[in-house]
Curated annotation (Swiss-Prot):
Gene3D superfamilies: 3.30.390.30, BFD-like [2Fe-2S]-binding domain (1.10.10.1100), FAD/NAD(P)-binding domain (3.50.50.60), Sulfite Reductase Hemoprotein, domain 1 (3.30.413.10)
Organism: Bacillus subtilis (strain 168)
Function: Required for nitrate assimilation.
Cofactor-binding details, from the entry: Binds 1 [2Fe-2S] cluster per subunit.
Domain of life: Bacteria
SUPFAM superfamilies found in the cross-reference section: FAD/NAD(P)-binding domain, Nitrite and sulphite reductase 4Fe-4S domain-like, Nitrite/Sulfite reductase N-terminal domain-like
Pfam families: Fer2_BFD, NIR_SIR, NIR_SIR_ferr, Pyr_redox_2, Rubredoxin_C
Keyword Chaperone among UniProt keywords: no
Cited CDD domains: NirB_Fer2_BFD-like_1 (cd19943), NirB_Fer2_BFD-like_2 (cd19944)
Record protein name field: Assimilatory nitrate reductase electron transfer subunit
InterPro entries: BFD-like_2Fe2S-bd_dom, BFD-like_2Fe2S-bd_dom_sf, FAD-bd_OxRdtase, FAD/NAD-bd_sf, FAD/NAD-binding_dom, FAD/NAD-linked_Rdtase_dimer_sf, NiRdtase/SiRdtase_haem-b_fer, Nit/Sulf_reduc_fer-like_dom_sf
Keywords: 2Fe-2S, Electron transport, FAD, Flavoprotein, Iron, Iron-sulfur, Metal-binding, NADP, Nitrate assimilation, Transport
NCBIfam families reported in the protein's UniProt record: nitri_red_nirB
Length: 771
């Protein structure tokens, strides 16, 4: 089949991240052609200030070498700009008069420095700070001149100013506002930062409006609205950026400040997408790395036809990249009538912390002088955790040892590149890594904005500590593959697989048909990802079982009479009572099963439902009918729900006559409400489950049990029992999730969506499709 052609206009970080995501999802789908205006492969523009400050070299900031493009069969045209899009013919035209057709086009033209529209702005010696060429020019100018001025005291302006100072120049920073970094810091943090930078030798001219630049052959003086002026041999414009939308405008694509896109980064023109600093989503143009990478994932999934979450916007976070200064902020920073706040200011230690809350949910954070807990606070911000959790994190930050000791392997260290603690640990052990640079090349952590570099350094130090325990290596899932179970799950989420055979083929299984370990596991995970679409499996058993459903363990004469007639009519050889208080009919001929189901006229479970939730054992002592009613209610709501492994649930009175404490999930009715226990084990190695929580009434009990089951479904491995799952995740973590109302509500909503599909199934022959 002929490949579609995917053309990328722009060879920067956002565009190339899209291509990387596309290659992960389906490396054979597109012929990829990339045009880049600059004469370089993709590099990290964010770290140009680090080059200026002497913290990195130009080679260090290269993200994708020419070999990477060649390895993936990508055609790269450097130093060539797309100047026109013919939407009727689906063609792009470049400044070298090259015409190329496309099936899909991604516009990733980025942004340009905002050069103030004032007299003299075009003189020699006035620069933006955006490209490698800009960086090289500034480094060259610093060798010949002494006085520099930076217009703009945002992130880029301050980083450039410190870089020029590192090169030996006297630097003045000019800013139109009363405080520096006003988009990221409040007045207190801005004042503290300014004081620290002044101690390093920078001079600040605040509330200054630049009106002109003068000089004979080159710029040598800046003039202000108040009549004053400043001598400057070198002037850097860092007063913001403007999205490059000219290409879209000329093609008739809808624009505002940026190119307007939807939640999948599609423009108003079919088959044309936009991403990065040129794109505008819901009225916002993002200039930070993490949001652009999040956009790239949504775009790549949509362009490859893979079901994915829509891009919903991002909570911006920013860290100042200046050695020896710890400043970080995220989300909302200015107070208003809707906000409450927690502030900590230790003047002697030079530490300032502020957390803003809206409706008792964390909405924004500023950290100055101590940013150790920024990753946890960012996680709390993204999940909108309530005030009690965030308050503890901001008041009592953990030192690196306990922080990493308690941090799960799944927690993200590098937000830009979605690199987890576990991925870094695995890379360090597998490849004997010892430096941050080696970790970056192996995992991409620290390779984008650089904000996680201190955290990665701390993790490396912690891993050399005597208290560090090396995590056990994860074996491959089975002998058919080298993938671990988590690897397989990640691939299933990433790619549009249609059946187990396709999974095994595309993931290079060593055996053609898999084995009894991997095939049912893949089947289960696909059903979890696409609920309600079940691939029929050939019957392998010589006989079948059938369990009539009796909600809450209760029945009546009519049901029993019907069951008895069925037993006689079909000569059922074996009838028994299950642990879950149900009748089990065994030894049924497969050919008889369809007619038996019709004759029973009641819900049934058969072999194919072996891991579905079948029954909830309820107290039969007669003290309280509400217990049986609650069991029946939950059974009806969760009927046919697929589970990773068989699960036992029991509801009991205060005497625990159903041994609820020994079940996977058990709820015991008390005078105060309900005690919910989880993780019990029956049999020769019996153990009571741990008390998970206490609920007030039947509704809250049902909600907690259903939320718990859904979280188990979403995070447990195939055939992983509840007690094993608890041991792996930790009961504290599970409590944190289920006790938070918003997260529990999300779980219950997901459960209801899954149930609506499961209980109204569509049978596909060999295919899984999302409804």
């Amino acid at each position: 089949m002929k490949k579609q052609r995917l053309v990328l206009a722009g060879n920067g970080m956002a565009g190339i991240r899209c291509i990387e995501e596309v290659l992960k999802l389906n490396r054979h789908m597109f012929e990829i052609v990339i045009f880049g205006s600059e004469p370089h492969p993709n590099y990290n523009r964010i770290l140009l200030s680090s080059v200026l400050q002497g913290e990195a070299s130009l080679d260090d900031i290269t993200l994708n070498s020419k070999d990477w493009y060649d390895k993936h069969g990508i055609t790269l045209y450097t130093g060539e700009t797309v100047i026109q899009i013919d939407t009727d013919q689906q063609q792009v035209i470049t400044d070298r008069k090259r015409t190329l057709s496309y099936d899909k086009l991604i516009v990733a033209t980025g942004s340009s420095p905002h050069i103030l529209p004032i007299p003299g702005a075009d003189k020699k010696g006035v620069y933006g700070f955006r490209t490698i060429e800009d960086c090289q020019a500034l480094m060259n100018m610093a060798q010949h001149f002494q006085k520099a001025a930076v217009i703009g005291a945002g992130l880029l302006g301050l980083e450039a100013a410190v870089g020029l100072q590192h090169l030996g120049m006297d630097v003045s920073v000019i800013h139109h506002s009363a405080g520096i970094m006003q988009k990221q810091l409040d007045q207190t943090a801005a004042r503290l930062l300014q004081t620290e930078l002044e101690q390093k030798g920078l001079t600040f001219l605040l509330e200054k409006d630049t009106v002109s630049i003068s000089g004979a052959t080159k710029a040598d003086r800046i003039h202000f609205k108040d009549g004053s002026s400043l001598k400057a041999d070198l002037i850097v414009m860092a007063a913001g950026v403007k999205p490059n939308i000219e290409l879209a405008v000329s093609a008739g694509i809808k624009v505002n400040r940026g190119i307007i896109v939807n939640d999948f980064m599609q423009t108003s023109e079919p088959n044309i997408y936009a991403v990065g600093e040129c794109a505008e989503h819901n009225g916002t143009v993002y200039g930070l790395v993490a949001p652009l990478y999040e956009q790239g994932k949504a775009l790549a999934s949509h362009i490859c036809g893979v079901p994915c979450e829509e891009y919903q916007g991002s909570a911006p976070s920013a860290a100042l990249k200046i050695a020896g200064i710890d400043v970080w902020s995220a989300g909302k920073i200015q107070e208003d009538e809707r906000t409450t706040s927690i502030k900590i200011y230790d003047e002697q230690a030079g530490v300032y912390k502020k957390a803003l809350f809206v409706d008792d949910k964390l909405a924004g954070v500023i950290l100055f002088g101590d940013t150790r807990d920024k990753q946890r606070l960012l996680d709390s911000l993204l999940k909108q955790r309530d005030i009690s959790i965030a308050k503890k994190q901001i008041i009592e930050p953990e030192t690196s040892g306990p922080l990493f000791e308690s941090m799960p392997s799944s927690e993200t260290i590098c937000q830009c590149n979605t690199v987890t603690k576990g991925a870094i640990e695995d890379a360090v052990h597998t490849n004997s890594l010892t430096t941050v640079e080696e970790v970056k090349h192996c995992t991409k952590a620290t390779g984008s904005c650089g904000g996680c570099k201190p955290l990665v350094e701390d993790l490396l130090r912690y891993m050399t500590n005597s208290e560090y325990t090396k995590p056990a290596s994860t074996p491959s899932f089975c002998s058919c593959t080298d993938f671990t179970e988590d690897d397989i799950i990640a691939e299933l989420q990433r790619r549009p697989f249609t059946n187990p055979a396709e999974v095994m083929n595309q993931l290079d299984w060593k055996t053609k048909n898999g084995c009894s370990t991997c095939v049912p596991a893949i089947q289960y995970y696909l059903e979890m990802l696409y609920p309600g679409f079940v691939q029929p499996e050939p019957a392998t058993e010589e006989t079948c079982i059938l369990i009539p459903q009796m909600y809450g363990g209760r029945t009546n004469a009519e049901q029993l009479r019907t069951i008895a007639n069925i037993i006689e009519a079909y000569s059922i050889p074996d009838v028994s009572i299950t642990h879950g208080q149900r009748l089990k009919l065994s030894g049924i001929k497969p050919a008889d099963l369809p007619n038996m189901k019709k004759d029973l006229k009641m819900p049934v479970y058969t072999n194919e439902h072996r891991h579905a939730l079948q029954s909830i054992k309820a107290c039969t002592c007669g003290q309280n009918r509400s217990i049986q009613q609650l069991a029946a209610q939950i059974e009806r709501q969760l009927e046919m729900l697929p589970l990773p492994a068989p699960i036992s649930i029991s509801l009991s009175c205060e005497t625990d006559c159903t041994e609820a404490a020994l079940q996977d999930v058990g709820a015991i009715r008390t005078q105060a409400g309900w005690d919910i226990h989880i993780g019990g084990v029956r049999g020769t190695h019996a153990r009571s489950g741990a008390l998970f929580c206490v609920t007030e009434n039947e509704d809250s009990t049902a909600g907690m049990i259903k939320g718990l089951i859904q979280y188990y479904r979403e995070t447990a491995h195939y055939l992983e029992g509840v007690h094993q799952w608890i041991d792996r995740l930790g009961i504290v973590h599970i409590r944190e999730v289920l006790f938070e109302e918003d997260l529990r509500a999300q779980l219950l909503e997901s459960l209801q969506t899954d149930l609506s599909l499961i209980q109204n199934p569509t049978v596909e022959t060999g295919a899984y499709k999302k409804g």
